[in-house]
From Swiss-Prot:
Residue ranges that the Swiss-Prot or TrEMBL entry lists as coiled coil: 27-63
Membrane topology term: Single-pass type II membrane protein
Keyword Amino-acid biosynthesis part of the UniProt annotation: no
Main subcellular location: host cell
Official protein name in the record: Probable spanin, inner membrane subunit
Subunit-level organization: Interacts (via C-terminus) with the spanin outer lipoprotein subunit (via C-terminus). Part of the spanin complex which spans the entire periplasmic space. The spanin complex is composed of spanin inner membrane subunit and spanin outer membrane subunit.
GO biological process annotation, one example: killing of cells of another organism
Role: Component of the spanin complex that disrupts the host outer membrane and participates in cell lysis during virus exit. The spanin complex conducts the final step in host lysis by disrupting the outer membrane after holin and endolysin action have permeabilized the inner membrane and degraded the host peptidoglycans. Host outer membrane disruption is possibly due to local fusion between the inner and outer membrane performed by the spanin complex.
Transmembrane segment boundaries: 1-17
Organism name: Pseudomonas phage phiKMV
Gene Ontology CC terms, in alphabetical order: host cell plasma membrane; membrane
Keywords annotated in UniProt: Coiled coil, Cytolysis, Host cell inner membrane, Host cell lysis by virus, Host cell membrane, Host membrane, Membrane, Signal-anchor, Transmembrane, Transmembrane helix, Viral release from host cell
Domain of life from the UniProt record: Viruses
Amino acid sequence: MPRTIVAILVLAVVALGASYGFVQSYRALGIAQGEIKRQTARAEALEVRYATLQRHVKEVAARTNTQRQEVDRALDQNRPWADRPVPAAVVDSLCNRPGARCAVRTPTD
């Protein structure tokens, strides 16, 4: 009889331990699933943002290409003017703007 009681107590402790482990695992699973949902939503939002940025880059590239073609046409139509150097004061004025990309001018330019 005492062995039976000890065996029942041991089985009860093992069952409680297993139940506790199951509850903890189930709780961790719920937390992980919530994190997966959050990360999936974040990834989808980033994909939308990336697609929007790609579209804007293509639009800017198209506008840049159009403007480049217009400048090239204007220069071709005004070859005598286009073949002369741009005056230093004009270069300085154009390059002294935010976002302007100009080569460094030496004093002899």
